[in-house]
Amino acid sequence: MNTLERKLPIGIQTFEKMRAEGCLYVDKTAIIYQIAATKVPYFLSRPRRFGKSLLVSTFEAYFQGRKDLFEGLAIEKLETKWEQYPVLHLDLNAKKYETAADLVAMLNQYLEKWEAVYGDEKKDRSPEERFSYIIEQAYLKTGKGVVVLVDEYDKPLLQALLDENLLDEYRRILKAFYGVLKSSDRYLRFIFLTGVTKFAQVSVFSDLNQLNDISMKIPYANICGITKKELVSTFTPELERLAEVQEMSFEDTVDKMTAMYDGYHFTYSEDGLFNPFSVLNVFDGLMFDNYWFQTGTPTYLVDLLKQSDYDLRLLIDGLEVGSSGFAEYRAETKNPLPMIYQSGYLTIKNFDKSLNLYTLGFPNDEVKYGFLKFLIPYYTPISSDETDFNAVKFVRELQSGDVHSFMERMKSFFADIPYELNTKTERHYQVIFYLVFKLMGQYVDAEVRSAKGRADAVVKTKDRIYVFEFKLEGIVDEALKQIDEKGYLLPYRTDGRELVKVGVSFNAEERNIGEYKVV
C-alpha cells in the first residue's frame, strides 16, 4: 500500500476529526467500553503528548452516541444501544494561567457555552454554583445522566507550582468547582479526569472519595501509548517506508524505534509503550529525532529543578523508591522526583515485590540524551543546542588516541564555567564529568561509576579502552595507584585493545583540573 494514501493524525486530538479524515487509529475502544460501562469517577495521569486528549475526545464521541465514528473498531461489536447523553467537556490545556482571574475566565467561558444549551439561573453566581445548576438542568431536560470529562485538570496548578499563594488560590477555586461532582452525584452518569500529576494532601478531588485512580493499575496500563504489537500491526507500511529511506532492514528499524521511543511502563507488569507523538513524527519525517523532547521541557519542571538540591546523577543511573516517593507530588517537600516521573522523564524499569520497591529510570534513548542535554546548561556554560557538537569532539579525540587534547578540552570546559555555576564541592565536579561521559555514550561505549568498586569512568573505542580515576585535591599518582590496586583493568586484560590509564586531580581553589597523567 502507498503510505502517501494513509493519513497520519499529526496534530489531531479530536476523535471525530481523526475518523472523519480517515486517519490511522490505534484501536483502544475495547478498554474504553469497559471503563464507560461503570459509573465510578476515574482519574488518569499520563505525560504530556501521550494521547490523553484523544482519549477524552473518544469518550465524548461514545457518550454522544456517535456510532458512525466507531465503524470497524472493537467497540462496534460490544455496544448495542448507542445511547446519547449530555456531555460537559472541560479542557484546561489551552490557556496560560497567570492570575486567578485567568482561571475563572476560562471556567466562565465553558459555563456560558453550557448555559446556552441548558439554560442559566443567575450569571452573578459563583462558578461552582453555576456548574451545579447546569448539571441538574442537563439531567432534567434530557432525562439522561450527565457525562463530565475534564482534560488536563492540573494545568493551572502546574503553572503556579512555586508560587504558594497563587497555588492555594487555584486549589481553592478548583476544589470548589470539582466538589460539585460529589453533590451532583444523582445527576451524573460518568466522570473521567486526566492530568500530568496527582497532587497529594489538599487535593482538588478530596470530596470525590470514590475517585478511581487508574494511573498505575495493570488493566489500564496500555490505554494511552502504543505497544510494540500495535506498532507493527497498525504501521507496517510506515515502518517499511522508514526502513527503505534509512537503508535499514525492517527488523533493525523496529529495534531502532524501540531503543529511541519505547520503554514507558506505568505499572510493574505490562508491555513497554511507545510515545505516540514521537512515533507519528518519525513516520511523517522519515528520520529518527528527539521529537517529544524538542517540544520543550515544561516551565514548572525547570523551575522545580532549579530550586531543589537533588543529586541528578541518581536519575541517570536509575534509583529505587517506594510508590509513595513518586506517585503523588507534595509541594511542600520540593522533591522533584514525582514531577520528573509523572512528566514522562522517568518510568518504571523494575519492581521488587518482596520489598515493594520500584526502580525508576529513563524510558528510552530519546528521553535519556534529551534530559542530559537539558541538564548541561545548569552546570556548564554550554547551551543545550551545543552539547552534541561538544560530545562529538570529546569522542573523536579518544578515538584517535589523543588523550592530551581530550584533557585540555576538559580543562577549557571547566575554565569557562561562570563563577556562580561552579562550586568547590566534589559533587559538582563529578556531575560535570558524569554528564560529559554520559553524553559521549551516544557515540561510544562509555560507562560512569554508579557504585564503589568500579573505575570513575571507562570509555571503549574501536582500538582502545580508557580507564579514568578522579581525585579532588589528590595526587595524580594516587589515582593511578587506585586503578591498579582495585583491579579496574582486570576485566579487559584479554580484550585485545590497548589499555590506557588516566589519573586526574582537581584543584578546588582554581576550580579546574589540576594535573593529569596518562599511562
Summary of predicted features, one role per range:
Residues 1-425, 440:
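Phosphate-binding site recognition
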Residues 147, 464-466, 500:
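Structural motif
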Residues 433, 457-472, 486:
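Conserved catalytic cores of phosphodiester-cleaving nucleases, focusing on short active-site segments
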Residues 436-450:
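A short acidic/basic microdomain associated with nuclease active sites
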Residues 451-455, 497:
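Short beta-strand or tight-loop elements
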Residues 491, 495-519:
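Domain-level recognition of nuclease-like catalytic cores that cleave nucleotide substrates
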